[in-house]
Amino acid sequence: MTWPGGFDTQLRLDGSARDAVTREVGDAPIVVGTATTSVGIGGNRTIEDITASSGRAGLSDLVGHRGGGYLRGALDQFLPGEREMGTPLYLLLDDISGASLIAGFAWSRWRDEWMGRPSLTIRPDMEGVCIGFAPGSGALDEQRAGGGTHRVQIVPSLVNDADPEGWHKLADLPPTSMRRARRIDVWRDPVDGTIVIDSGFQDSAGDPNHGRVAIHEYVLRATADPKTLTLLTVSPEARILPFRECPSAVNTASVVIGTQLDELRTTVLQRLARAEGCTHLNDALRALAEVPILLAQLDAALATR
């Protein structure tokens, strides 16, 4: 997430996704799917231009739509089948809503006046929008009193020196930038075949004093039934969140246990709406709908060894 024209100009969302299979520990990953997107976001989180590596028909019909819940309906309307196929392209497009919502936080690290802008004051309709802003929340009081302070943590590079190919090539970002990074690792338990999921999610910004700081970070560990592909267990870990109330969201995730994985994109929104859940944990849970596709790719690769 960058602003090539500088402060208060068009936001660019440049996304990259990769599906890859590793057959054995130490093997190089086998890339089985990729996608890239570039989206221009104007005022009111409106899509002004959009391209993708696939050249998918229907993309241009998204121009004029806003990032937010209604964008998901537009994705289904203009790009039918992408959600059901769990494509890397869909994962990137689905993130337009969340990315356009949090992108501006990057400027709070560089411009002291940013947090006090009128557009950032808590409106009456923000109460109850998520578990952090539930009625009576201290986070609401902090924001109303003058912008409050987001709790952040300094974070190192995402790249693990012991597994340098664990991520696709990450873009070199300018100092004033925001990045949303997610991973979904899937394997079968060698003893009973249970599907094991380890997923991570991080929103971070460039910082003039600390290199990079994160404002949201979750890790999800889950299991699923190998025959029915239903969610058996889910254990979210809230590592970095902006307000004291936010970590309580981890206690809400159990309501989606028993859901078929490919139905998580809709079930999460139905059961964890507004103050029942956390917007960012919901994003992490919804992305697990891609697991059946990843599992099929894993099985196909292992079958050809």
Language-model features, listed with the residues they occupy:
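Active-site- and interface-proximal helix/loop "cap" or "latch" segments in soluble metabolic
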Residues: M1-S157, D203-R305
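Long, positively charged binding patches that form subdomain-scale interaction surfaces
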Residues: G138-A214
